[in-house]
Amino acid sequence: MLFTQLIILLTVTSQALSVTISDLNNIASNQVTKRLGGGSRGGSSSGSRGGSSSGSSSGSSSGSRGGSSSGSSSSGSRGGGSGSSSSSGSRNWGSNQYHCSGNSCGYGNYYAPSTAAAAVGYGTGRYTGGTQYGNNQYHCSGSTCGYGNYFAPSAAAAAAGYGSARYYAQHHNSTSSESETISGSSSLNIPSTHFYLIGFAAAYSIVL
């Protein structure tokens, strides 16, 4: 009689545990799905950052990040062709190519970072000093971006083509877009039959 009662008690307990584990599985699955967002997290970031560099523009248009930038500033107007120097000092640079110094970028006459850089043609194709990067492709250093001659973060980066599509591809594994999709669910996956076996084993050991 006692053995029969023990078997009944353990069977009921096993069924209750089975229901509880099933509920835990469902709860865990829902929680993981909520945390992962259940779908796409991300997107694409494609498009060109920049544009053509033609037209009349000049000055130290700081904050500009490429584009067909035009306008005027305190350094005067340089109508689209000859970028001859008319303002101050030996550090002035006179080409009409987009270039930057520090956090300021612009077309036309613009200060080179040093007298030596201006003397050897800062902003022209022949400038190769230091870590200067000299083609007319959109590129960035730190948080500042621009066309034309611009300082690469290192000599190695300049030599590897810093700012070019191949450089970006080598360092980002993608040239135009990045996306990330994370979805799914998880559960404890504990079979309820295990609890029946555990219950009967416990009952058998008690009887013995």
Curated annotation (Swiss-Prot):
Keyword Cell membrane: yes
Propeptide: 186-208
Listed GO CC annotations: plasma membrane; side of membrane
Localization (cell): Cell membrane
Domain of life: Eukaryota
Region: Disordered, residue numbers: 33-93
Main location: membrane
Function: Predicted GPI-anchored protein which may have a role during host infection.
Biased composition (Low complexity): 54-63
Bias-annotated ranges (Gly residues): 36-53
Induction: Repressed by HAP43. Down-regulated during oral epithelial infection. Up-regulated in response to galactose.
Family under the similarity heading: Belongs to the PGA37 family.
UniProt keyword list: Cell membrane, Glycoprotein, GPI-anchor, Lipoprotein, Membrane, Signal
Signal peptide residues on this chain, from the entry's feature table: 1-18
Official protein name in the record: Predicted GPI-anchored protein 37
Glycosylation sites: N173
Coiled-coil region: none
Membrane-topology descriptor: Lipid-anchor; GPI-anchor
Lipidation (GPI-anchor amidated serine): S185
